[in-house]
Regions:
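Active-site proximal beta-strand in glycosyltransferases
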Residues: 1-17, 31
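A short, active-site helix/loop in glycosyltransferases that binds the activated sugar's phosphate group
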Residues: 19, 28-51
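Carbohydrate-associated surface elements
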Residues: 36, 55-58, 70
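Conserved catalytic-core segment of nucleotide-activated headgroup transferases in glycan assembly
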Residues: 72-116
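Conserved active-site histidine-acidic residue motif and adjacent donor-binding/catalytic loop
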Residues: 108-112, 122-137, 148-149
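Acidic donor-binding loop of glycosyltransferase active sites
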Residues: 137-149, 159-160
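A charged, aromatic-enriched C-terminal amphipathic alpha-helix characteristic of glycosyltransferases
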Residues: 176-205
């Protein structure tokens, strides 16, 4: 029964090969968590546009919100310390030095360069935590690669965020600072869940 059931395939990255879309006749819809992934699927895998729906990462809007926000002297980068984020982190080290801010890194260390960058007096490191909102709420601004969860969480807390677009090697393609959007509700957990439910209803009708 299972092999023949219609399916939805969700893709979470356009730069990690393990996230390449599965092409199978039982897959009736693809979900891309950002527009760039949709373009990647259309251009590199010839998946028709009408088969791809952009549904963003859901974020708990009760956990991440404007209340108790403040502004301390650090730029926050949340994410695994690995090859994919190395160039962005190095760029942020220089940026924060120029503007007189500290750079706080929060995430699992899965690289070989953390010890070296911590030699910079204005760089601090914290391990992964389930209470990342405590860091976001007090930050000056945040930064991350692609349009990821941390950027959305930051917007919900009223913080601007730098988005670094990188290639599969982590090299910077572009960077741009984004203010919180006016349509922030599209990232709310219940709204995202409803959109996914609607897509399943469509393919099962």
């Amino acid at each position: 029964m299972y092999p023949e059931l219609p399916k939805i395939c969700a893709i979470h990255s356009e730069v990690i090969s393990l996230e390449d879309p599965v092409v199978d006749p039982t897959i009736k819809k693809y979900v891309a968590i950002r527009p760039e992934i949709k373009e990647h699927m259309m251009n590199n895998f010839e998946i028709p546009e009408e088969m791809i729906e952009v549904i963003y990462n859901p974020v708990d809007n009760e956990k991440f919100q404007l209340k108790n926000a403040s502004e301390e002297n650090y730029v926050l980068f949340v994410g695994t310390i690995d090859y994919l984020r190395k160039e962005s982190i190095l760029d942020l080290i220089e940026y924060t030095k120029e503007i007189g801010k500290e750079l706080w890194l929060v995430g699992e260390n899965n690289g070989n360069y953390l010890e070296n960058i911590l030699l910079e007096d204005h760089v601090r490191y914290f391990p992964s935590t389930w209470k990342v909102e405590d860091f976001i709420l007090k930050s000056y601004e945040t930064a991350g690669i692609q349009l990821g969860r941390t950027t959305i969480e930051s917007w919900m807390c009223g913080k601007s965020s730098w988005i670094y677009k990188v290639d599969s090697g982590g090299f910077i393609l572009s960077k741009e600072k984004h203010e919180p959007p006016t349509d922030i509700e599209k990232y709310y957990t219940m709204n995202v869940a409803q959109k996914i439910k609607d897509e399943y209803i469509k393919i099962l009708e």
